[in-house]
């Protein structure tokens, strides 16, 4: 009787273990920056699910930056563009402080997308907040998703509620209404 109970419990344990949700395993490579890689993996496993579609996981990451990160005005020295080192530094700082400018938000978005297995590139350009206004320097992300080039701009997707647009997997045509950039510079 005791042996039957043990076998039954063991079988039940195996069934439960097989049914347990599997953690999200990103397809991309880590950056090599241990602190950043640990924080990114933790965030992805918290926000994404192996059961979700690709679009649902991309939306979850975008929404995290758009809604859980506070905008802090400021500029980084972008004279040399977004080097890997600067991108990683901005992303890690943003994860720790939970506030940052468009450069930091774009850097984190790119790092997360790359870790998820997508080709992602930071874009520098300008943004016009309202018709007739002067353009301001701005940064966002271009990525290949399902073979299609799309854009992510979490800053104007959440932090500026009066101006909120859905720039998650946005086509170029949508961004061209307010964003300006050199499309020839994109890979």
Region locations from a protein language model:
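Repetitive helical segments and hydrophobic/amphipathic motifs
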Residues: 11-12
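Secondary-structure boundary elements
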Residues: 30-96
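Low-complexity, Gly/Ser/Thr/Pro-rich intrinsically disordered linker/tail segments
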Residues: 165-187
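Hydrophobic/aromatic-rich core segments of domains that either
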Residues: 63, 104-173
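Bacterial signal peptide processing site
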Residues: 20-22
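Positively charged n-region of N-terminal signal peptides that target proteins for export
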Residues: 1-4
């Amino acid at each position: 009787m005791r042996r039957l109970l043990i076998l039954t419990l063991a079988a039940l344990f195996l069934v439960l273990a097989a049914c347990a949700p599997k953690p999200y395993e990103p397809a991309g490579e880590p950056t090599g920056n241990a602190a950043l890689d640990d924080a990114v993996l933790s965030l992805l496993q918290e926000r994404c699910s192996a059961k979700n579609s690709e679009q649902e996981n991309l939306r979850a990451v975008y929404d995290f930056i758009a809604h859980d990160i506070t905008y802090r005005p400021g500029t980084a020295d972008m004279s040399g563009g977004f080097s890997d080192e600067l991108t990683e530094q901005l992303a890690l700082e943003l994860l720790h402080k939970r506030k940052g400018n468009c450069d930091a938000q774009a850097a984190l978005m790119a790092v997360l997308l790359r870790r998820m297995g997508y080709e992602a590139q930071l874009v520098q350009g300008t943004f016009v907040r309202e018709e007739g206004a002067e353009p301001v320097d701005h940064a966002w992300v271009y990525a290949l998703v399902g073979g299609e080039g799309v854009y992510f701009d979490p800053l104007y997707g959440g932090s500026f509620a009066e101006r909120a647009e859905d720039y998650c997997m946005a086509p170029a045509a949508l961004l061209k209404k307010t964003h300006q950039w050199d499309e020839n510079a994109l890979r």
